[in-house]
Structures are given as C-alpha cells and as structure tokens.
Regions:
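Conserved N-terminal catalytic core of the sugar/cofactor nucleotidyltransferase
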Residues: 2-5, 13, 27-115, 125-127, ...
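A structural signal for short hydrophobic beta-strand segments in well-ordered beta-sheet cores
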Residues: 25, 156-159, 222
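A short, conserved acidic/glycine-rich loop-to-beta-strand motif
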Residues: 135-145
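Conserved catalytic-core motifs of eukaryotic protein kinase domains, centered on the activation segment
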Residues: 16-19
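Catalytic-core segments of class I nucleotidyltransferases/pyrophosphorylases
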Residues: 111-113, 120, 126-133, 146-149, ...
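Active-site metal-binding loops of divalent metal-dependent hydrolases
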Residues: 10, 117-119
Length: 248
C-alpha cells in the first residue's frame, strides 16, 4: 500500500531548532520523529512511501535514502528550485505537493494515507482505512476527541450524525466550539481526490481543498479514534513527545 508524509514545511513555530534541522528530523531520544512514522506505516503494510521535501531537504533524504534499511521504499518530491547548484525550497502547500507528484507520475493509484511529518502517533491505520472504505469516502480526516477546555489550541472538525464533515473552526473559544473533535493531520484519500486539486499552484488541504469538498457535498468524513497523538509543532509539545517516549 502507498502513503505520503508531508515534510516540506519550515517549522517556524519550533524555531530556533528548525533553523538547522527540518521538523521531521527533530530527534526524539536520538531518533527523528519521521522515523517513528515510517515504522508505523510499515507495521500496517504501507511499504511505498512518498515524501515531499523543501526546507533542508538534503537532511531528510541523506538520512532515510531509499528506505531499504527501514523495510520500505521511499521516494522524494522536491518543492522549490535549483540556483547556482543549490536547492532553494518553496513549498506548494500540502495539497499542491500531492498534486505535483501525481502530475509527474501517477503514484497514487489506490486508497492512500497522508501523514504530517511532525507528529508522534500510535494510530491503528488498518482500522482507520477500513472505516474510510466502509463509508465509501472520497476523503477522511482522522479525528481525536479532546476536553472542551482544550479546543482553543486546535483546529476543530464539525460533523453530522453520520460523520460527514460539515464545517471547520480554527482554534475556537470554549464557548464558540461546535465540537470537541480535532484534526490530527492524518488523512485517507481515494485517487479521485486529484480531480479537485489544481495543478501548478500553491494549494492547501485545510485551507483550500477541504472547504471545497464541504461546499460540493462530497463524501468527506471524519472518524474519531482513540490513540496517542503529539504534535511537535510547538516547543512544549516537543517536550511532551520526549516524555511520552520515555514513559513507553
């Protein structure tokens, strides 16, 4: 099975760490966070993994190479340009990066999973994909329920009684939140999703594609699952991830 890891961001919220280290390479006890994701994907049968890279792309590619030593096949899609022999990164947005890959070579030919490269998770991906297929979904967001007093730190997903996504709220106040289900940056798609992503421009999953799917009334679902998830996008979250690994 095939998957994609989003690894092109600059990691501005974790500076100064990311001035010299791309976010997916931030170490959790001397092991890059992306390595945990590769191991999770392999465990659930995802052995062909595409990684979009941009900021400090060489750091990621030189460490993981073709993925053979991790038991998977890794390929890379660079976003940016080459000037005077140097790579200059310019990310295309999460959906734009996916589309660039598919336009160049139709890599995604069946149900596939997309993970953000800066989170530590222990999700049962097999069960998540099964739910996606049972719903006949074009796109699925894996959600996690959080206490109501924590919603203002996350992107909230609003669904109907059948799980169909109806709206999003970005870090709403406790009083304004219409849901306690949050977007974990874990997505499942069918290849037909590329019909709704334009080519050659910056296009984001959360900011562009998902609102478009809601407006269209597409079979776009959210599934709430119980799993450990730590986004290392902020320094306090990074230390939480380290403590989590130490405690097993």
């Amino acid at each position: 099975m095939k998957a994609m890891i989003l690894a092109a961001g600059k990691g501005t919220r974790v500076r100064p760490i990311t001035y010299t280290t791309p976010k997916p390479m931030i170490p959790i006890l001397q092991k890059p966070v992306m390595e945990f994701l590769v191991e999770l994907l392999r465990k659930h049968g995802f052995d062909q993994i595409m990684v979009n890279v941009s900021h400090l792309a060489d750091e990621i590619e030189n460490y993981f190479r073709d993925g053979q030593r991790f038991g998977v096949q890794l390929s890379y899609s660079f976003e940016g340009s080459i000037q005077d022999g140097k790579l200059l990164g310019k990310a295309l947005g999460s959906a734009g990066g996916m589309k660039k890959i598919q336009d160049f070579y139709p890599f995604f030919d069946d149900t596939f999973v997309v993970l953000c490269g800066d989170a530590l998770i222990d999700l049962d991906l097999t069960a998540a994909v099964q739910q996606h297929k049972e719903k006949g979904a074009l796109a699925t967001i894996v959600m996690k329920s959080v206490p109501r007093d924590a919603v203002s730190s996350y992107g909230v997903v609003v669904t109907d009684e059948k799980g169909r996504v109806k709206a999003f709220q970005e870090k709403p106040s406790v009083d304004e939140a219409l849901s306690t289900s949050i977007n974990t940056g874990i997505y499942i798609f069918e290849p037909e999703i590329f019909q709704h992503i334009p080519s050659g421009c910056e296009f984001d999953l959360g900011g562009d594609l998902f609102p478009k799917l809601v407006e269209m009334g597409a079979p776009f679902y959210g599934i709430t699952m119980d799993f450990e998830w730590v986004d290392i996008g902020k320094v306090p979250d990074y230390w939480q991830a380290v403590r989590g690994v130490l405690s097993g």
